[in-house]
Amino acid sequence: MSVGFIGAGQLACALARGFTAAGILSAHKIIASSPEMDLPTVSALRKMGVNLTRSNKETVRHSDVLFLAVKPHIIPFILDEIGADVQARHIVVSCAAGVTISSVEKKLMAFQPAPKVIRCMTNTPVLVREGATVYATGTHALVEDGQLLEQLMSSVGFCTEVEEDLIDAVTGLSGSGPAYAFMALDALADGGVKMGLPRRLAVRLGAQALLGAAKMLLDSEQHPGQLKDNVCSPGGATIHALHFLESGGFRSLLINAVEASCIRTRELQSMADQEKISPAALKKTLLDRVKLESPTVTTLTPTSSGKLLTRSPVPGGKKD
């Protein structure tokens, strides 16, 4: 099995690192495409030994499981570009927020009668094999296809199948959740520094507190409210701190954050359905539609041993 990523950004980098660290895939079995080869994430993928190309079509040809790891509004243009190269063997996995299975299937069915499509939502902690992933299978995807994706994603954290109409809410909760946690941790560390702690120690203590709390919750069957109560002594420091958080609307802010992320996810789907995208974004993403300033394109070609090597064709294209 080989895995391809259309897009070589943070998500592709995190998944590739997670898959290789888990031992479920070797780096030479992974390929990623990006129109820009000087990105930090591309450099990280290169150091891992992942195959890299500027051609999205090349990525499709050399993969069995294909992750669409680009911005939601770019998905329709990607599908138009690679549709003719998608074959019956491919499992097309959309990781883009808000992009529905039906919209991907509709595009691909112009080229292939029964495309196997899976929609998933994951998060960046897959990098350290502590991700949270849900997925929903499309009309033509087999049970075995879903099981294969679950095997992949379970190697980098928690993974479960859900109904598709729940995925937007998942995006607002666990998809965006790490950012909420990082912001909270940054603020906690600031509080520690304000009260005299060195920054490095404050960050470490805050991170360990969040990590420990999460592990306690996952390892127990207790409600988070009960675990919270267990920390609060009558008249103690913690209950006074919680009162301060409550008076500032702490719970409501988190609820509203999840809701805002979910609503924005649905707006992104609307943009994707209308195929709205700026010319600049299109130029950055689609190599085959918009010529890059440099006519040299790095592609991958199989050798007689089955390995993939990079090659650069002789420049011959004209600039627009």
Swiss-Prot record:
It holds the Pfam family F420_oxidored. InterPro entries: 6-PGluconate_DH-like_C_sf, NAD(P)-bd_dom_sf, P5C_Rdtase_cat_N, P5CR-like_CS, P5CR_dimer, Pyrroline-COOH_reductase. It catalyses: L-proline + NADP(+) = (S)-1-pyrroline-5-carboxylate + NADPH + 2 H(+); L-proline + NAD(+) = (S)-1-pyrroline-5-carboxylate + NADH + 2 H(+). It is an enzyme of class 1 (oxidoreductase). It comes from Bos taurus (Bovine). It is found in: Cytoplasm; Mitochondrion. Residues 298-320 are annotated as: Disordered. The gene is PYCR2. Keywords: Acetylation, Amino-acid biosynthesis, Cytoplasm, Mitochondrion, NADP, Oxidoreductase, Phosphoprotein, Proline biosynthesis. Homodecamer; composed of 5 homodimers. Interacts with LTO1. GO terms for biological process: cellular response to oxidative stress; L-proline biosynthetic process; proline biosynthetic process. Its main location: cytoplasm. This is Pyrroline-5-carboxylate reductase 2. NADPH binds at residues 8, 10-11, 34, 36, 56, 70-71, 97, 230. Oxidoreductase that catalyzes the last step in proline biosynthesis, which corresponds to the reduction of pyrroline-5-carboxylate to L-proline using NAD(P)H. At physiologic concentrations, has higher specific activity in the presence of NADH. Involved in cellular response to oxidative stress. In some cell types, such as erythrocytes, its primary function may be the generation of NADP(+). GO terms for molecular function: pyrroline-5-carboxylate reductase activity. It comes from the Eukaryota. Its EC number is 1.5.1.2. NADP(+) binds at residues 6-11, 34, 56, 69-72, 95-97. The modification N-acetylserine is found at residue 2.
